[in-house]
A protein has these predicted regions:
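A short acidic, Gly/Pro-enriched loop at the edge of an enzyme's catalytic core
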Residues: 120-131
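Short alpha-helix
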Residues: 183-198
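Conserved class I S-adenosyl-L-methionine
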Residues: 2-62, 75-79, 102, 162-185, ...
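Class I SAM-dependent methyltransferase SAM/SAH-binding core
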Residues: 67-121
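Helix-to-beta-strand junctions that scaffold the AdoMet/dcAdoMet cofactor pocket
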Residues: 85, 141-142, 155-156
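A short SAM/SAH-binding and catalytic strip from SAM-dependent methyltransferases
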Residues: 131-143
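A short glycine-rich, Lys/Arg-flanked "PGG" loop and its adjoining helix->strand segment in the class I
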Residues: 145-157
Length: 219
């Protein structure tokens, strides 16, 4: 769950095929976040209200199963528990063990299960989730469209996908010293096409100065 001011590693070129590229992606991602996990909330812990607002805006149904994929330190978990209510289920999944360790207090308070998992190959049954919350995740996957397809596999018809970042795309690009382009995965056109190609309907797209929010509905 990247912060507004922290660049994440770009997927590296494969050393010798897809399997090697996948292992390298996992190793680099874990190394990056493991080294920052202990101080993450100290540096970026003031944006929980923005996470809560994004969850509330999505309209997750009560009693459902909500999964925070790429959960980081668990900043969305209290809001997800509030959304699904006492009879719902909340799952926090992340690729980095150290991030899951930092998420334990939030997970305990939200009665959320912690799962070590790769967002590209989730250990959940087809159609078992009512909603996914993904903060700063999809555009950093080696293949964002394949990532959307995997999330679609796990989501029931009419289920929700919330893509979020507590900073708008232009502001985030400026902080990282790069120029924003319209062919990036989270640009409106590419995201609309990739969601449509993977079983989603893009229902809302809001790229503001102080947040990015997109809502897709499973077809």
């Amino acid at each position: 769950m990247p912060s507004p001011d922290t660049p994440v590693p770009s997927p590296s070129a494969p050393a010798s095929g897809p399997a090697s590229a996948s292992r390298r992606y996992i190793a680099e991602t874990r190394a990056f976040f493991a080294s920052r996990a202990a101080t993450w909330d100290t540096r970026f812990g003031d944006d929980m209200p923005a996470y809560a607002a994004a969850v509330a805006r999505a309209g997750i149904r009560r009693g459902g199963v909500a999964i925070d994929v790429g959960c980081g330190t668990g900043r969305a978990l209290p809001a997800l528990r509030s959304a699904v209510g006492r009879d719902g289920a909340v799952i926090a999944a992340d690729l980095t063990p150290e991030m899951l360790a930092q998420a334990r207090p939030q997970a305990a308070a939200a009665r959320a299960a912690l799962v070590l998992a790769d967002a590209r190959r989730l250990p959940f049954a087809d159609g078992s989730a009512d909603a996914f919350f993904a903060a700063g995740l999809v555009n950093h996957l080696p293949d964002p469209q394949a990532g959307l397809a995997e999330l679609a596999r796990v989501t029931r018809p009419d289920g929700l996908l919330i893509l979020f970042h507590p900073s708008g795309r232009a502001a985030l690009a400026a902080r990282h010293g790069r120029t924003l382009t319209q062919d990036e995965p989270l640009s409106a056109g590419p995201l609309r096409r990739s969601t449509a190609a993977t079983g989603w309907r893009l229902a809302a797209y809001d790229d503001a100065v102080d947040h990015f929010f997109a809502l897709a509905v499973r077809c």
